[in-house]
């Protein structure tokens, strides 16, 4: 609070008595009983209006307000040049100090002194300005390699001092220990994502900010698979992979690299998969195919043979002709046996 500089003179005896009693006669921190309830401490949120209550005993008594040793008001005279301060005048006895848009610089002790015909009476109020939490510094988004040690930083101000907590935003999100720093040792790909810092002190809503962590890792091929391949028709092989940065895919048949548009081959590459399609399968297309996935951290591959379909039908282990012959033989033997038993029965 900006107060008028020293140099103002006392123009009447009661003001001199007030100043002398406040600055000389009363020990620091001493309070005198009032006929009204005294307020020892007041909590006000930053930006709000604080009203420090003080009352005169009668219309003849005079009052004064001080902040530490600086005079704010003496009677109806304002000594402070701060436009935010004023005296409340709800009634003749009301001599409350009003401070608009309070700030942390308004923190501290305030003294109201009432000068009567006998002795001055004083009341002290300690004003505490509470400040909502505010995160003023947090780690930037980062990209690091898997296995690296990481420290995330989140700094905040507020009064009371805010409690800082961290949370990993993921399907298996779990809170970490409170603190300005979050240490992650040997970070894994599963620990990539957004980390949320929250600063809270119950004065207002928590202040929340996020850090995005990208974890690079070498590619892996999770699956390589083909569908039914029939000569004269289309066939495809699908290669599923993962890696950060996203891997680049290549295809080989044996030792020969394949390219899109070569001999009826179509290659479609995506961030996590590659699809090789043969538009018109011939005998030359059968063989061993290899999918290669690579990024700046490494290379991996997986192979799959592309074979022609089997000519044997389900449940049949021989030719149709052989099966027909066996069936005919079985019928012939059955007929011979039946005739033999019938002849024996007639003879008996």
From Swiss-Prot:
Q: Which residues form the signal peptide?
A: 1-31
> Where does the UniProt entry say this protein principally localizes?
membrane
Q: What does the entry state regarding organ or tissue expression?
A: Expressed in brain.
Modified-residue entries (Phosphotyrosine), positions: 181
User: Which positions does UniProt annotate with glycan attachment?
Assistant: 67, 149, 269, 280, 288, 301
Listed GO CC annotations: dendrite; late endosome; neuronal cell body; plasma membrane; postsynaptic density; side of membrane
Q: Which UniProt keywords apply?
A: Cell adhesion, Cell membrane, Disulfide bond, Glycoprotein, GPI-anchor, Immunoglobulin domain, Lipoprotein, Membrane, Phosphoprotein, Repeat, Signal
| Full protein name | Neuronal growth regulator 1
Q: Highest lineage ranks of the organism?
A: Eukaryota, Metazoa, Chordata, Craniata, Vertebrata
